[in-house]
From Swiss-Prot:
Cell location: Cytoplasm
Family annotation (Pfam families): PITH
Gene Ontology biological-process annotations: positive regulation of DNA-templated transcription; positive regulation of megakaryocyte differentiation
Domain PITH per the UniProt entry, residue ranges: 19-191
Protein name per UniProt: PITH domain-containing protein 1
Organism: Danio rerio (Zebrafish)
Function (record text): May play a role in promoting megakaryocyte differentiation by up-regulating RUNX1 expression.
Length: 210
């Protein structure tokens, strides 16, 4: 199915090639709004590696920075933001093999979440496709992901390997920073042509669980 999805819709004409990377790079700037020093990744094989996968769009395929799970295939990212976020979409990219995440479960506003807490019902869950080039976005149910100050991403399983490897996690949405006398809203979405939105090729590959 992945071959079918990549073969259609998103043409490789020079016009799209010139404009799309800049637009999508603007959309995925929410990583700048993460309180990175307080970000936690549970079950990472090396301390601090979980922070490395929240990086600029143009580094999304960089294979030098990644996180790998330790004791088993699960990972749990606890992501505090410096303000309030309305999350609209997520990209998660790994290796093109069995170590790629196969399912993620999203929780909001549960600081210091542990694996024991993952037994509760998530706000949303996705079955993933292998996406080594970070091309597939999974759209969130926006009504559930407004006013997010803390996001937890539970990688519950992969495609069969003993450990899971993640290279990039991209977050798209709006950020609201509260000041004493005003509120600044940063909308990380380019004014893109709907025809550029890969709807035809992405939709068949995005499976909602809940």
């Amino acid at each position: 199915m992945s071959g079918h999805g990549h073969g259609h819709g998103h043409g490789h004409g020079c016009c799209e090639c010139e404009h799309e990377p800049a637009e999508r790079g603007v959309e995925y700037e929410l990583y700048r709004r993460i309180d990175i020093e307080k970000l936690q990744c549970l079950n990472e094989s090396r301390d601090g590696d979980g922070k490395l996968v929240f990086k600029p769009w143009d580094q999304r395929t960089d294979r030098n920075k990644f996180v790998e799970s330790d004791a088993d295939e699960e990972l749990l990212f606890n992501i505090p933001f410096t303000g309030s976020v309305k999350l609209k979409g997520i990209i998660i990219s790994g290796e093109d093999d069995e170590s790629h995440p196969a399912e993620i479960r999203l929780f909001k506003n549960i600081p210091q979440m542990s694996f024991d807490d993952t037994s509760r019902e998530p706000e949303q869950a996705f079955r993933l496709n292998r996406d080594p080039r970070a091309e597939l976005e999974y759209p969130t149910k926006i009504a559930r992901f407004s006013n997010v100050e803390h996001l937890s991403i539970h990688v519950s399983r992969n495609f069969g390997a003993e450990s899971t490897r993640v290279y990039y996690i991209g977050l798209r949405g709006e950020y609201t920073e509260a000041h004493r006398h005003e509120v600044t809203i940063c909308n990380y979405e380019a004014a893109a042509n709907p025809a550029d939105h890969k709807v035809e090729s992405i939709t068949p590959q995005t499976q909602f669980i809940s």
